């Protein structure tokens, strides 16, 4: 991680040299950039860093208010094709959302959900909608024709299920954990299922113009975040306790260790590129990306492998 003499000389010639890396402060499974700062990895990479907060990492990255963040492909991919100034630079983890139904309901598979209302809590056209479409499509269910995807906020989904307004909802595994454990909900399809376990859910993303103008600094930033992800993967108990102590994870220690172990933090570049391309192809086919239809062209802006 420490820059070589050659890297340091190259960094000094880049416009962002001497400026603080603005990492987007997030918690839970997207805390990699924050953990990198806490463990001193940016300094080790020859960089100064400062955390920034906001309502949307997509807006923060696209406007240059943040340099780096970890977040859902499903949140950022469509904006990237709509000229938002973001590119993916590395993989983060698999997981971390699933389709849930009432445990005592008649629904046991996605096939059973045909003709019903399913909630994508953060809204139509947003990340939950996109993920729901992918999960249904994988089982041969047309998300536009075979079901009705609607928006019911996560905290209202249980009531809506009980009242029969919706059959299922896409929820974060963290949110649903206690409800599954107490027998209220069951999972019928997940991004952790075997056929999705070879796809990134979340990725390291950066401001695209910054990456273009500062390739070596961008490489060192990405390496710092990847080192944090490796730490989280290799030391799940210690990392979980640290995240809880810092207030970056909610819920129980037991739940967080289990979920952190399932996410496979720190995915390599080849895996990430192949899985991103696969997701792009699905988004184009399902009409989730509407203003571009060439996978290579989309990949040319969405994927910048700074570690190569």
Walk through the language-model features, giving the residues of each.
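Pocket-lining segment of extracytoplasmic ligand-binding domains
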Residues: 73-74, 150, 155-245
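Conserved C-terminal helix/tail region of periplasmic/extracytoplasmic solute-binding proteins
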Residues: 280-308
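Short, glycine-/small- and polar/acidic-enriched structural segments
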Residues: 2-151, 167-173, 184-190, 197-198
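Short amphipathic alpha-helical segments at helix boundaries and their inter-helical linkers
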Residues: 66, 162-165, 262-275, 302-308
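Short, hydrophobic secondary-structure boundary micro-motifs
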Residues: 45, 88, 240-242, 291-293
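Secondary-structure end/capping motifs
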Residues: 212-290
